[in-house]
Amino acid sequence: MVSEAPKDRLVKVYVSETFKADNEEFLKKMNYEALGKDILEVVSDNVFVRMSDTQTPQGIMAVVKMSEITIEDMFGRDMHINSMNGKNDVNNNTDSNNAASKDDNSKNDNSGNSSNTIQPLLLILENLQDPGNLGTIVRMAEGAGVTGIIMSSNTVDIYNPKTIRSTMGSLYRVPVIYVDDICKAVDECKEKGVKVYAAHLKGTDNYNQKDYAQPTAFMIGNEGNGLSDRLTQKADELVRIPMQGKVESLNAAIACTILTYEAVRQRL
């Protein structure tokens, strides 16, 4: 993940003495020294272990400055976006060698001309508490071309180390923002012509019966309690994911993926 960090946002890169000795070609290729003489710092293995939050650190970590964005920035974005996130700095203590394949996501506009601009596809998350869930959602969001993720202020910290690792580098490229008033944020989306759907047990229609080719937002609630009544009332429509057996609900990340990729399918 460190190798994927936008170089213009790198504040500091720390490597252990062992990592430096074993990865000279990698460090030469990354050329961190060109960013400034103080960017790269080599520390002893013992110091690096104390700096890390994992028992077997890989020997490289970074401090990356993230740009702040507004909800306005999430409408009609280019598919090949740079990461712009709603908080400042983050310690990134993860693998430098992760890589992911990317598809050509170019779309055609209504005139038939080639365009990279897509209709807004947003995720609105309320009070998610599991770092792994949030990280999985961010990673999925990049693959699906989600234009932004809006989170309530009581959602787990996106910069939780477990969350960062779960994103597998997607955190650099998916715009995310925390808001103090999630209902107000939904109102802003609706004012921009975004239709808001809530995944809800009281949904009367199956999720695949709606039109998501238009500007769309999906609301996903807390793992145990779902969406609050206050936020549910802001939805234009409630949809449900049909299930069999005694299962009443799905994992938040799974539900989010099902809904989002239905929108992707419709937009192909």
Where are these regions (language model features)?
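Short, hinge-like loop/turn segments at secondary-structure boundaries
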Residues: 30-32, 58-60, 165-169, 213-217
